[in-house]
Amino acid sequence: MPADFTIVIPARYGSTRLPGKPLLELGGKPMIAHVCERALEAGAAEVVVATDDARIAEAVDGLPVTAMLTRTEHASGTERLAEVAERRAWSDDTLVVNLQGDEPFMDAALLRALAEALGRREDCRVATLAAPIHRPEEIFDPNVVKVVTDGENRALYFSRAAVPWDRESFAEGAGVPMPGMPYRRHIGVYAYTASYLRRYVDLEPSPLEHVERLEQLRILWHGDRILVVPVEGAPAPGVDTAADLERARRHLSGRTP
């Protein structure tokens, strides 16, 4: 597969918790501009902002990115990516990284590493990231999604539950896994081949994704493989709530003179 990759940033205007989230101000510019900068730092051959609102497209005018107005009815960012791939007529082996529009502090090096890892594998058409869990309480936190892989770093399952279940330690109520047990948290950034994006839109939702509220389980349910790329640390969290926005502003003001 080619070494070049494209980054698509799906950015909806509507948000239950933070309406107009991509346009909210961070350090004197809209959040979506920060996300575009992270994508450009990764060295992508092309960066596309896929949005359902002209105001978001206007916010990135002047940046070396392509803004594309997409349909409003998409149920997920992945479906929005698939529309972009189809309209741009990307070849089947084009590598496409999905960077959410509320990730202003994403590590650009992780985006490149993700795309490069997928490009080296012939057995997977989807890849994502995972980092070690160091705090035992996170194993039981349903907001921390865990991932279990096989010996080739292909995902076996994603869950909000404590997986793998340490039968000895957890049954005794210790709440601390056996030393050396490799618990990993999923980092919700994905890379796909354009051919897989075209396949994805034809897949029926699965019971597992409805129960866990994890879209990636649809891929496993239909027998497809997800490469899980191990990284040492998780990036700073994205912005989902008003409290997250204030934290992001404090983080940025502390980093910027």
Curated annotation (Swiss-Prot):
GO-annotated molecular function: 3-deoxy-manno-octulosonate cytidylyltransferase activity
Cellular location(s): Cytoplasm
Enzyme Commission identifier(s): 2.7.7.38
Pathway(s) it belongs to: Nucleotide-sugar biosynthesis; CMP-3-deoxy-D-manno-octulosonate biosynthesis; CMP-3-deoxy-D-manno-octulosonate from 3-deoxy-D-manno-octulosonate and CTP: step 1/1; Bacterial outer membrane biogenesis; lipopolysaccharide biosynthesis
Keywords tagged on the record: Cytoplasm, Lipopolysaccharide biosynthesis, Nucleotidyltransferase, Transferase
Entry's Gene Ontology BP terms: CMP-keto-3-deoxy-D-manno-octulosonic acid biosynthetic process; lipopolysaccharide biosynthetic process
CC annotations in GO: cytosol
InterPro entries: Cytidylyl_trans, KdsB, Nucleotide-diphossugar_trans
Recorded catalytic activity of this chain's protein: 3-deoxy-alpha-D-manno-oct-2-ulosonate + CTP = CMP-3-deoxy-beta-D-manno-octulosonate + diphosphate
Biological role: Activates KDO (a required 8-carbon sugar) for incorporation into bacterial lipopolysaccharide in Gram-negative bacteria.
Family (UniProt): Belongs to the KdsB family.
Protein name: 3-deoxy-manno-octulosonate cytidylyltransferase
Naturally occurring in which organism (per UniProt): Methylococcus capsulatus (strain ATCC 33009 / NCIMB 11132 / Bath)
Lineage: Bacteria, Pseudomonadati, Pseudomonadota, Gammaproteobacteria, Methylococcales
